[in-house]
Amino acid sequence: MHPAHEGLSAMPFYDDFDLSTVDVLLISQYVYAHLACHGSWGSAHHWSRTMSAQRALAVQRLVYHYEWNIICILPLDFDDVPFPGAHQCIYHFGPFFLTPFLVVSPSNMLTSGSFHVDHAASLPYVLAKTNFKGRVFMTHPTKAIYKWLIQDSVRVGNMSSNSETKIQMYTEADHLNTYPMIESIDFYTTHTVSGVRITPYPAGHVLGAAMFLMEIAGLKILFTGDYSREDDRHLVSASVPPGVKIDVLITESTFGISMHTPRVEREAQLMKAITDVLNRGGRALLPVFALGRAQELLLILDEYWSKHPEVQKIPIYYNSSLARKCMQVYQTYVSAMNDNIKRLFAERMAEAEAAGDTGRRGAWDFKFVRSLKSLERFDDLGGCVMLASPGMMQSGTSRELLERWAPDPRNGVIITGYSVEGTMAKQIVHEPDQIPAIMTRASNAARRPGQRENEQTMIPRRCTVQEYSFAAHVDGKENMEFVQEVAAPVVVSSAPLHTHDEDARTNGVIDSGSR
């Protein structure tokens, strides 16, 4: 046992709870069954000497199955506490219920590892609707994008949910009113709250994503959250905190033991798939999340177009009003990105100055990508490449284009990220003969004479479908290498019940427990 465990009783919040009243095995099983998310709850008392090995392992499993790193979760209330679902954009704010064990102590601190909704979307609820009185930390880019992303999610949820089934967990006003409570912090800076020290380190994954090193009474715990170690065009990849002996490592295992195709090979396959569609006169649809991998894909496409004059007359469109707002954040935080994007930024500046054009010299000022404000302004004639959100194609622009383009065999859909079960993105990968029409215009066009009003309208699917993963998560090999580099005596890994790779569920993962 780590000697720091003995020091926990001296912590200011230690007397606020009684572990003997908590059935952590039941809690762990409930979380596994009901929460499809992949952040982390952390608590000083999880490592208490009062726990048996079995109970400690159960809590270790619990630690990695909620949306933030939170210090000191108190089992004081057994009423149902509703929290937003992990993927609200898909489920239209349908809630999961954490039952029956949580209220949050006023002495807590809260950190968000990234701006993605499955890590941050419950934050306005916690700040506006619970008794949480602690401090909240995000990196500067995470906080900047979080503001726009959650605001957009609330608006989309309000528009897409009918009044009979809608359960609104919080309002846009709740989000904006609690936003000033969030403190922006820099990577590599240490912050102390109630004797707990936290230090954020780059996690790769998306702009601003952070791993958090926590020190509790001398015990050092590293939460990776979602992280990536692959060299790409703009992110600083995750690395082991230098000069720190980690006692407990809590890491994601999104892809289990499966391994990514090498990056160069994946990019070549992606570009061949796109150009094959274009060469037959078709349109290539890439459904994407508005922020995250979409920016990496735009860099890949813009670079390829700049090197291949034969495709430069074919337009690349990016349709996302949210992304247009947030691209200024990407421009602002180029200094927080890797050397590849910094070099591109310097080259663009030099080119612009040489041409006397001071208006287009940012690394994110694309040469061949056009921002599309709405489909009303889209001249749908001839071949093109279209990156459109949402990534799951449950509704919105990507779904409307899918329904419009699916009947034409010249067109192609290319999936570039993970696909959630039950969504159109997951269904289309299996190449169904037909897809349901849910968008008004496509539905009306496909309606048969004499079809009943409530009868489901189906659209033939003749377009090609291909899938190439560019999800910014470590694969099994990268994760294992990171675990070995950290060399922590205790390693806790997310279980296969939540993984973006369905094959990993059957292939197995690094499981929770001690090395």
Spell out what each predicted region is.
Residues 90, 222-224, 230, 252-261, ...:
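Acidic/glycine-enriched edge-of-secondary-structure segments
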Residues 3-10, 42-44, 51, 56, ...:
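Amphipathic alpha-helical heptad-repeat segments
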Residues 9, 204-209, 216-247, 252-262, ...:
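Active-site-proximal loop/helix segments of hydrolase catalytic cores
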Residues 24, 221, 247-249, 283, ...:
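Structural motif
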